[in-house]
Amino acid sequence: MTKKTWSDRFEGTLHPAIALFNASIGFDIELIEYDLDGSIAHGKMLAKTGIISPGEAEQLVQGLEQIRQEYRAGNFNPGVDQEDVHFAVERRLTELVGDVGKKLHTARSRNDQVGTDVRLYLRAQIDDIRQRLRDFQAVLLQLAETNVETLIPGYTHLQRAQPVSLAHHLLAYFQMAQRDWQRLGEIRARTNVSPLGSGALAGTTFPIDRHYSAELLGFAGVYANSLDGVSDRDFAIEFLNAASLIMVHLSRLSEEMILWASQEFSFISLTDSCATGSSIMPQKKNPDVPELIRGKAGRVMGHLQGMLVLMKGLPLAYNKDLQEDKEALFDAVKTVQVSLEAMTILLDEGIVFRQERLAEAVAEDFSNATDVADYLAAKGVPFREAYNLVGKVVKTSLAAGKLLKDLTLAEWQALHPAFEEDIYQAITPQQVVAARNSYGGTGFEQVKMAIANAKAELSQT
């Protein structure tokens, strides 16, 4: 077994099973490029402050870049005996450049090193996810633009309530994604702070320049307290919270896609490129994409809860428990990324809205009942009185097997003399939707304005 960096303190050797249990190289290799970036910045800072010579710093940088090339070429594959990515890099660096490689860890601990790596990693992944959110929003917006006057039943309690523009429905998810995009931007700012130079917990005796290394790494600032710097995982928890919300939004949309694709709704058809079949039932076309997204949402939420529980009992400063933050974080990042990609593809090419069925759906129920009450209220009838009257109309119409549009004018006027011929136009699905022209409503003019506003939001960086 490879000699541990810290083994001179001990007389015995580490039990192989404990070494395996302790090792994180199997998953923290994900951080290697960020570990190399942090080490390069640290080496340059050591030279700038006179702790090592410029020539030594150059050797360190060259060695670290060689490790990067080896990793990218698939030639750097440290085993579990290397313990973690930090030791693996340091050991390989020393093989490449000799004893000068042993100087890299001057004025640095693995505690501030890993904190730096994770922040660099998460900063990059946040940028990636924000772009994926933009791609998702762009497809939603494209669908909305082509379906302003396509109507779909709107629901409360999963019961038909009022018809809405399909574009209006899609834009609701656009706004959810917009909040997700904004939220990640705020979290990025709090992630973009450097703990490098905090040492193990108390800082260092060397005359380092933390601001210089932070500047080299693109951080906006440095932690003001070394204890906080090495022990803080607020940024990871905040990210997992934001990731959970993204998955909640995708899961809600997925649930609707699953319902809409069912024979009972039949609002959409699934294309062959985004559906699968059954191993036993030849007629089936299954909505696997939204079902998987719905399932993966719980996985990400579990990571959030796990991280909160992980942190709740940790005294300052660093504890080995924090090794457990990475697998949850890495998996949540990848799950959000693939889920956004899959949903974007599904919306772009995987579904077709069944226009005839949607038109039937908004015309076959009593979702225009509120408009009858509004009609009477506009003619001076107190709304609550109008509401009660229309409730009775719906009850008697159901008993007679009629819809509101089937009532004769005489039947309307027998209910209340305020009804006139224009009641029929007022309760058509198109008019019901068009009339809701309040700001943020489903009226066609409002939806067109919302699309224009969404385009402006999409151009934000």
Swiss-Prot record:
Additional facts recorded: A mutant overexpressing this enzyme grows faster than the wild-type strain under photoautotrophic conditions with 5 mM NaNO(3) as a nitrogen source. In contrast, the growth of the mutant is similar under photoautotrophic conditions with 5 mM arginine as a nitrogen source.
Keywords: Amino-acid biosynthesis, Arginine biosynthesis, Cytoplasm, Lyase
GO cellular component terms attached to this protein's record: cytosol
Protein name: Argininosuccinate lyase
Pfam family, any one: ASL_C2
Description of activity control: Strongly inhibited by L-arginine. Inhibitory effects are lowered at pH 7.0 compared to those at pH 8.0. At 45 degrees Celsius and pH 8.0, activity decreases to 94%, 74% and 37% in the presence of 0.6 mM, 2.8 mM and 10 mM arginine, respectively. Activity also decreases to 86% in the presence of 10 mM sodium succinate or sodium citrate. Activity does not decrease in the presence of 1 mM or 10 mM L-lysine, which has a similar structure to arginine.
Localization terms from the record: Cytoplasm
Molecular-function GO terms, alphabetical: argininosuccinate lyase activity
Temperature dependence: Optimum temperature is 45 degrees Celsius. Shows more than 35% enzymatic activity in terms of relative activity at 20-50 degrees Celsius. Inactive above 55 degrees Celsius.
Protein EC: 4.3.2.1
GO biological process, one term: arginine biosynthetic process via ornithine
InterPro entries registered for this protein in UniProt: Arg_succ_lyase_C, Argininosuccinate_lyase, Fumarase/histidase_N, Fumarate_lyase_CS, Fumarate_lyase_fam, Fumarate_lyase_N, L-Aspartase-like
Main localization of the protein described in the UniProt heading: cytoplasm
Catalyzed chemical reaction(s): 2-(N(omega)-L-arginino)succinate = fumarate + L-arginine
Biological or metabolic pathway of the protein: Amino-acid biosynthesis; L-arginine biosynthesis; L-arginine from L-ornithine and carbamoyl phosphate: step 3/3
Function: Catalyzes the last step of arginine biosynthesis, the conversion of argininosuccinate into L-arginine and fumarate.
Alphabetized CDD domains for the sequence: Argininosuccinate_lyase
Entry's family note: Belongs to the lyase 1 family. Argininosuccinate lyase subfamily.
pH dependence as annotated: Optimum pH is 8.0. Shows more than 35% enzymatic activity in terms of relative activity at pH 7.5-9.5.
